[in-house]
Amino acid sequence: ADATASGSSALDTLMGAKIIAPDGGGDDAVRSSVQTYYGETLQTSDDLKTSACCTPYDLPKRIRGILSNVPDEVKAKYYGCGSPTPQGIDGLRVLDLGSGSGRDCYVAAALVGESGRVTGVDMTDAQLDVAKKHAESYCVETLGYDSPNVEFKKGTIEDLAAAGVEDESVDLIISNCVVNLSPDKPAVLSEAWRVLSSGGEFYFSDVYCDRRLPDEIRSHPGLLGECLGGAM
């Protein structure tokens, strides 16, 4: 289906019921709630109140090896729910939607090699600070590259153009337990469609539900932050 058809009922159904903004606000109130949760309420994955994020799963041997060299601070502030980064992506241009502390970007930086490029987009300053803090040392000292092949940009995943992501500029998009947090999920898919090059692919891990969520869950700031309030 054409992901630009953001108003289609089929796409809206796929994306689940719309998040109810805390305190009756709009989309900006939802984003503000998410920023507060991931920038202030959570300091490490130990602070999570549910198992929706960071559900145990087996990782490929190569990914485990790469993760062993990722800085501890980056891993401590990881709140994903899977491993959306495929292997065999040498030389590709990768975009991570809602990159957080950068864990998956660091993994991708190793997988694409020095000729590849990885960009992470996130809206939370506290997470971006951690991601940027270790990028150069990780790429140059740990991976042995001449210069970093990963960068992080501030922006929302519903408006990648504002973050400077151009049309058909990436070969692979990844996203780890983030689309559920968006107040406008059709816009996320529309932007993904726009920035992917011809033949590009979108890999994501996220939270789904098998029934309609009650308003009490869709409007609860804590459950939104824990990836339940916006489950698809």
Give residue spans per PLM region.
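A short acidic, Gly/Pro-enriched loop at the edge of an enzyme's catalytic core
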Residues: 159-172
